[in-house]
Swiss-Prot record:
InterPro entries: Ribosomal_bL27 (IPR001684), Ribosomal_bL27_CS (IPR018261). GO terms for biological process: translation. This is Large ribosomal subunit protein bL27. The keyword Lyase does not apply. Residues 1-22 are annotated as: Disordered. It comes from the Bacteria. Gene3D superfamilies: 2.40.50.100. GO terms for molecular function: structural constituent of ribosome. The gene is rpmA. Belongs to the bacterial ribosomal protein bL27 family. NCBIfam families: L27 (TIGR00062). Keywords: Ribonucleoprotein, Ribosomal protein. One of its GO terms (cellular component) is cytosolic large ribosomal subunit.
Length: 85
């Protein structure tokens, strides 16, 4: 029986699906209430005025207006606010 024995299978060959994180609306862009501004893991960006924070730390607009990024506080934290137009 001149048959080749089955070779071992590779232990690589899998990867997790990308989670599409990141900034969805940039500074100066107009948004409507409920629009997602940032999808993130943890609080890389913090919620400022008129911005809500979901349980997965997603930041979203609570009012219509323009997106404003700012760095403030003693720890130089990045805040995102919505400024009414």
């Amino acid at each position: 029986m001149a048959h080749k024995k089955a070779g071992g299978s590779s232990r690589n060959g899998r990867d997790s699906e990308s989670k599409r994180l990141g900034v969805k609306r940039f500074g100066g862009e107009s948004v409507l209430a409920g629009s997602i501004i940032v999808r993130q893991r943890g609080t890389k960006f913090h919620a400022g005025s008129n911005v809500g924070c979901g349980r997965d730390h997603t930041l979203f607009a609570l009012a219509d207006g323009k997106v404003k990024f700012e760095v403030k506080g003693p720890k130089n934290r990045k805040f995102i606010s919505i400024v009414a137009e």
